Amino acid sequence: DVKVTQSSRYLVKRTGEKVFLECVQDMDHENMFWYRQDPGLGLRLIYFSYDVKMKEKGDIPEGYSVSREKKERFSLILESASTNQTSMYLCASSFTGPYNSPLHFGNGTRLTVT
């Protein structure tokens, strides 16, 4: 069974706190992605990784960093959370292949920064 697991469904943090959002996939996928989903803006890519220790900035990397120490785990880090980072965060993974491999999404983490 295809599975992408995010650490929490709901998180509430204070402004200035450090936040870790964890994502694990059990399908041996090379590619992993972190998105945020906001009303009227759709899915926006924050960072992605195509292998261990590899990371690439997406469209909105400002205020975020990532870690990919193991193939199955991709962590999104907010060094100092701000209220404009209140959002739904979605992790996804896919195989690398000669065709467009489908993205498998986690259930999402709703982060509220107060």
Where do the PLM segments sit?
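Extracellular domains of the immunoglobulin superfamily
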Residues: 1-114
